[in-house]
Amino acid sequence: MALTLLPALTSCHESPQYSNDAYGNFDALWDIVDQRYCFFSDKGIDWDSVGRQYRARIKPETNILELFDICAGMLDELHDGHVNLTSSFNTSYYRKWWSDYAQDFNLRTVQQYYLDFDYGSTSGITYKMLLPDSIGYMYYPSFSYNIGETNLDYILAILHKAKGMVIDIRDNGGGALTNISTLVSRFIDKKVTGGYILHKTGPGQDDFSKPY
């Protein structure tokens, strides 16, 4: 989710009830998140309470820089690394989703000590046979890298003698479900229910489609 905060947000916002000041900009942002964010119930977030808490920090003289920090702090309460607030001078980002945890992965260590700097790479996937005809290794650093069926054909042809497979997704920040499905489908030979998708269908916090 990307939200843009500008000094005159209401000039391009179709809701006339928002005043063109710090309060109006804050209220517009709060409403957008209230109507479109999906995980309030899952996370147990009282968005009304969060809104009151941060709105109370606004004063008539609050400038755009101060307002940005207030709004960014409110969005941080979602604890969601996919939610950003973007302006012409800054972009907020919830860093604690990774900064609060120890860094336990070093790509250089893998490349040097496990792969001996000798490996293949395609579609963002690093791959190699570890141990003679024994363990296949694939490192997929981001689900945003598009995987081609032909690329997978080559990788799996090279690793076809492997008795086991390591699919390393450490430090992967996420991406597209389609890429995950393309990869995982190569290791499943029957129909499997791996999850469900729900779509937001209305402005209410619990307005979702049926799972499919």
Labelled PLM ranges:
Residues 1-11:
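Sec-dependent bacterial lipoprotein signal peptides
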Residues 11-212:
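Flexible, low-complexity junctional segments that flank or bridge functional domains
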